[in-house]
From Swiss-Prot:
<keyword id="KW-0646">Protease inhibitor</keyword>
<dbReference type="InterPro" id="IPR013694">
    <property type="entry name" value="VIT"/>
</dbReference>
<keyword id="KW-0165">Cleavage on pair of basic residues</keyword>
<comment type="similarity">
    <text>Belongs to the ITIH family.</text>
</comment>
<dbReference type="InterPro" id="IPR010600">
    <property type="entry name" value="ITI_HC_C"/>
</dbReference>
<dbReference type="InterPro" id="IPR036465">
    <property type="entry name" value="vWFA_dom_sf"/>
</dbReference>
<dbReference type="GO" id="GO:0004867">
    <property type="term" value="F:serine-type endopeptidase inhibitor activity"/>
</dbReference>
<feature type="signal peptide">
    <location>
        <begin position="1"/>
        <end position="21"/>
    </location>
</feature>
<dbReference type="Pfam" id="PF00092">
    <property type="entry name" value="VWA"/>
</dbReference>
<keyword id="KW-0732">Signal</keyword>
<dbReference type="GO" id="GO:0030212">
    <property type="term" value="P:hyaluronan metabolic process"/>
</dbReference>
<comment type="subunit">
    <text>I-alpha-I plasma protease inhibitors are assembled from one or two heavy chains (HC) and one light chain, bikunin. Pre-alpha-inhibitor (P-alpha-I) is composed of ITIH3/HC3 and bikunin.</text>
</comment>
<keyword id="KW-0722">Serine protease inhibitor</keyword>
<feature type="glycosylation site" description="N-linked (GlcNAc...) asparagine">
    <location>
        <position position="580"/>
    </location>
</feature>
<dbReference type="InterPro" id="IPR050934">
    <property type="entry name" value="ITIH"/>
</dbReference>
<keyword id="KW-0964">Secreted</keyword>
<feature type="domain" description="VWFA">
    <location>
        <begin position="282"/>
        <end position="442"/>
    </location>
</feature>
Amino acid sequence: MVTLWWPCLVLALLSGLETSGFPRSPLRLLGKRSLPEGVVDGIEIYSTKISCKVTSRFAHNVVTTRAVNRADKAKEVSFDVELPKTAFITNFTLTIDGVTYPGSVKEKEVAQKQYEKAVSQGKTAGLVKASGRKLEKFTVSVNVAAGSKVIFELTYEELLKRNKGKYEMYLKVQPKQLVRHFEIDAHIFEPQGISMLDADASFITNDLLGSALTKSFSGKKGHVSFKPSLDQQRSCPTCTDSLLNGDFTIVYDVNRESPGNVQIVNGYFVHFFAPQGLPVVPKNIAFVIDVSGSMSGRKIQQTREALLKILDDMKEEDYLNFILFSTGVTTWKDHLVKATPANLEEARAFVKNIRDRSMTNINDGLLRGIEMLNKAREDHLVPERSTSILVMLTDGDANTGESRPEKIQENVRNAIRGKFPLYNLGFGNNLNYNFLESLALENHGFARRIYEDSDASLQLQGFYEEVANPLLTNVELEYPENAILDLTRNSYPHFYDGSEIVVAGRLVDRNVDNFKADVKGHGALNDLTFTEEVDMKEMDAALKEQGYIFGDYIERLWAYLTIEQLLEKRKNARGDEKENITAEALELSLKYHFVTPLTSMVVTKPEDNEDQTAIADKPGEEAISASTAYLTSQQSSHSPYYYVDGDPHFIIQVPGKNDTICFNIDEKPGTVLSLIQDPVTGIAVTGQIIGEKGNNASSRTGKTYFGKLGIANAWMDFRIEVTTEKIILGNGDALSTFSWLDTVTVTQTGLSVTINRKKNMVVSFEDGISFVIVLHQVWKKHPVHQDFLGFYVVDSHRMSAQTHGLLGQFFQPFDFKVFDVRPGSDPMKPDATMVVKSHRLTVTRGSQKDYRKDASVGTKVVCWFVHNNGEGFIDGVHTDYIVPSLF
């Protein structure tokens, strides 16, 4: 089932903060004045309001959070909001002590140039990241002086889409602390009239919800208000933490006295079409199921469960078959069969015996399914007034038979020839989702990701419920010739029960007296035509009262829908066509101030007397590639970085300084060193040293490298062991093993791990902490050298001030001075004197390599080299960092 998110409520309010010093001591607090309730580490979030205004399914949403720093020193305050992936951010403002810093939407390339020019020091990453199944997280943080107030305000818009007969509004509430004034205020205006409206919360009892929640609707207007008091927010009567942690949902629908409804405002029109009471068109459905080895275990079990449930819901008028593909292709029957009780019972027995096998031959599986549907129609095995549907489920990329994506697309396109839709279900993250989406879109279907979770079978069933009841086929929405411009998509292969078709456009003449819309389609029994006529004077009078919401809503709805459809069309366009589509979508995105995949929101924020600029981009559904995932944090050439690579060379680009310090650690192979240890986030990173081959392997004088790395998060009970051969992910007692030959992304709540075949892997924690491990491969027959690993910290700004380790101790700013530069023993490498941490050291100018972009060549990094295992620069001596094991 696809859940339809209502944008003004699809957000998580995650008010958090990072401090620049150590945590407060409880003993110190005893002597301080008492702080107002709801203050956490000196920061009080005293107001959060979500204001939502919905007019004719188009939602305009404003999230406002107000905070004050009641501490006696500056603090960092973070503002996090989760919003639907289908929503477009339209504005963000940051106000500190009455001074407002607005965001502006610019072309992505222009924004990137501004970003690189503006940031002169420190690290600033992209602000919007994918978060879970349907959400994106918008994050911005700012330093707030003692006693100062800050206001965050985010605005975004979205067209609500109807699913299974209703619009669902979903709110994930998680303020993380008591908020003196917390409010959700939603106003709905529907010219057709509201037929039902309800609201509920998973995190609060009905008794408490009843007094905090009010909901009402009458005629065209609906209202929902949720205002819990401080006491109602408490997790227990005497607790100071909040129970607001869960889902808040609102559902509603509108009256449908006629199949269609047309609204016209300021020269723009929108046509909603959702007929009811029609008989269901019989469907001919071919399920093409991946049974390759990667589907083993839980995936194949959940697939069987979902298919059995789908069989229970099949109607006797339907026809079906199952096509299984691995290295080859097998089918349940040679042709489609009717869903009689006897055939369904036989189908259940077949499904129960589905087993995983070997490789993934997507091409042959799809072509067999297409051939079966085509033949059923040609041989008159299915009713004349029926509709065909092809559904594919796969969890990976094609790796046998025809495996070139572009060739598979060509073969499928030529075989289907536009006669029926293809729906692609991508199971998990180890697949090319862009390919599945392009393949489906160009064949009049869509792609859907099925998340590897306990409810995967329910997700599969939910998809089937969407397409189970076609009421019309070949639907065409027609308007007066020469009377309209810039029409959105007006042709659809199916209309499914409980959904809604939406078409928008512009009128050539705003002063017309009448407007007519015709909808034609093939029904189960006959061809149908629905006509909607609009008297413009009556329309103007009827819509005057909606002005209190927002008057240009139809124009913005048209722009939103046009951009959305252009971006879909762009995915399969080539050459000049793609350039023209891109230019049109970009022009509209800029005109209407939408953050889309073609634009970025530029946010300038004050930081220590110097403004810094960050950009908010629109992430896509496809998993972020490694290059994107870690380069967003390195967009400025002056961003601080920390890494260890080579023999092993530790490289520290000092925060706030345009200079770099490096040192080596000489230890015998087998030694395990602590690189990062953060007791607050629970993150720890260790590395084990390897030596050269043969007799040199155990020598302390030969070259040494890191051959094994361990990354763990104690609070998540998660660990990763990385060697030059394999990667082992441990989640509690469960282990998953991958090789460096894989290209795969593994996600779970709070974490994403991406392996890029034979290159690198990216580990990203939700808090804004990212690492990259680079694989260095040498000639296997080399007599001395062997493969080794490099470790790079590319985003550490959310790690605590208590972080330590050979790398971690340098995440916080520190000062040093270099002077008395003089000739060294090597004429090309001058010596100098460095004063750091109260030590006076002799250092040497040299260079190392940064291998993130190219593991074979690398990029030169000039640094001051500290001798003797970093003595005087690192805390203590290097042997203090030796630990007994990786974990």
